[in-house]
Amino acid sequence: MTQAAPTTGMPRRGPTPDIFSPQTHLMGRLAFPVVTGLIYGYWAAANRRSGGPITGWNLLFGFVTAIVFALVLFAVLTIASRLRREVHAVMWTAFMGIAFGFLYSQSGESILRCVAMSLAVAAVTFIVMFYRFYTHEDAAGHRIR
């Protein structure tokens, strides 16, 4: 019975191909927070009106929420990748906990329930993000390839 001969040395993987231009990457970096902010703003406005009629104040609330969310998300995406892995995870934890808590508070639930739910979401986010950054970055926060 024949067997495949071992290869010489260790097989190496080449770099991941980059099929998009730098301009496309820049547009994606800007479009992601804007689109996500619009979805978040619509969701917050829908939670706030509780199925009632759409009013001008509700639209204003949704757009202001969308702008603030998009700006904060853009800041987190810009700043967080420069931080050490522990602080990087804490930054995403705070962002996700606050964002979820704000959305949940618009539904009319009690503030204690909103805080408890947002702390639970933040705890799960911290566990997932810390694991991800701990296994994919070195101690200085640089990606391991």
Regions found by a protein language model. Name each.
Residues 56-68, 87-91, 116-119:
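Structural signature of hydrophobic alpha-helical transmembrane segments
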Residues 75-97:
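Loop-to-transmembrane helix junctions at the membrane interface
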Residues 123-145:
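Membrane-water interface at the C-terminal end of transmembrane alpha helices
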Residues 41-46, 75, 98-106, 127:
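Alpha-helical transmembrane segments of multipass membrane proteins
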Residues 18-58:
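Membrane-helix boundary elements
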Residues 98-117, 134:
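Membrane-helix boundary connector in multi-pass membrane proteins
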Residues 1-13, 34-39, 58-71:
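Hydrophobic alpha-helical transmembrane segments
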Residues 44, 65-81:
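Canonical alpha-helical transmembrane segments
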